[in-house]
Amino acid sequence: MDVWKEFCLRVWKWFVKKPRVVDAKRSSEEKVANRYSPERMKRYLNAHYEFRYNVLSEINEFRPKGESLLGFKCLGKRELNALCLEIQSAGIPCWDRDLARYIHSTLVEDYHPFTLYVQELPEWDGEDRLVDLASRVSSEAYWVKYFHRWMLALLAQWMGKNTTYANCVSPLLVSEEQGWQKSTFCKSLMPEPLQAYYTDQIDLSANGRLEGKLGVMGLINLDEFDRLTSRGMAKLKNLMQLSSLSIRKAYQKNYAPLPRIASFIGTSNRKDLLDDPTGSRRFLCVEVEHRIDCSNINLPQIYAQLKAELETGERYWFTPEEEQEIQCHNEAFYQIHPEEELFRNHFRSALEGEACEMLSLSEILEVLKEKHGALLRNVSMVKFGNALVASGVERVHTKLGNRYKLVRVDADE
């Protein structure tokens, strides 16, 4: 009897304990299945989406896999949370912090918008489109030639070629007529994929922030150029000559080198917009002939042409001789100051071999003040001297300082 009881007890224990073993095994398997696996998460993401990191905006972007016609969208916090929930719905354990750690790592390939645009340009079909593009503004041969050169410098800047010769020349579209689409033309030079890197909002008093724009923007429009102050103009000329930048980004302690991308273009409703003759070589002034037609501009082929020309060694910088020609051409766009008008009434430049006086700036101004004292207050000696040289007056360096070779004339001549 005891033997029978013992047998029944063993059988009962076996039936009671077996489910527990099975349940324990099942629980263990579920724990393994529910354990976070970065590889499963990455496989899911790479199977369903494309990711990339924009090195200019420092923003992650994504789009559905295989949807090449769709543009990439910014991957913000809301999109990141939606992705996390989607992965969890697919039965894959995922925490938002783990997903963010992956997305914000070097495992996501980075890209440069301008480099990518140039790489994806079509082959040039051989048709010259730069003449037509320039002629939409003016058919003047001078403008057509140098606008082409400037466009080469613009693309060279985007391609990273312009490290020695910064694109330090800016076209200025001038028209006293309103509504001739000067600003629209400037913006239409920016390809659609790069429109985010065009701006006409510029504050020349914001030093560091403005230099930062040179490393991010592709084209900066100096809209209403004639409103710039003298201080702003000096700052602008300095910025235009920078070929490389040293920028400290937000939340970083150290400065880092940054290549310059930006080129400048500008518009004006006034013709007398330049006040520094020696610095005018930085501005390619053109008077707009008519309302600009901004339709049907084939930018892919225009930039494909420029790319092909650069790859065959076409020069993209302006020579000193070309800068001198630009400076001479810009005489029609100078501001004429009172002291210059008065000077022309009483002096002229001496001809070669002609008897003349050798006068200093102070001596010239003393003569003018005797006759027109009230009109000659706060005259800038430097600007006045530069204006004389720009107008053709010969300047001679002597032991007593600079002297100007002049002949006196009557105001009525």
Regions inferred by a protein language model and the residue ranges of each:
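Conserved AAA+/SF3 P-loop NTPase catalytic/coupling segment centered on the Walker-B
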Residues: 217-241, 274-279
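P-loop NTPase catalytic core of nucleic-acid-dependent motor ATPases
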Residues: 102-210, 214-215
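N-terminal nucleic-acid engagement/recognition segments and initiation subdomains in replication
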Residues: 1-127, 141-145, 374-375, 413
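A short helix-turn-beta junction within AAA+ P-loop NTPase domains corresponding to the substrate/partner-engaging
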Residues: 274-292
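AAA+/SF3 P-loop NTPase mechanochemical coupling elements
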Residues: 210-215, 249-267
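Conserved alpha/beta core segments of nucleic-acid transaction machinery
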Residues: 312-355
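Conserved catalytic/switch belt of AAA+ P-loop NTPases
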Residues: 234-256
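Positively charged interface segments
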Residues: 252, 290-294, 356-413
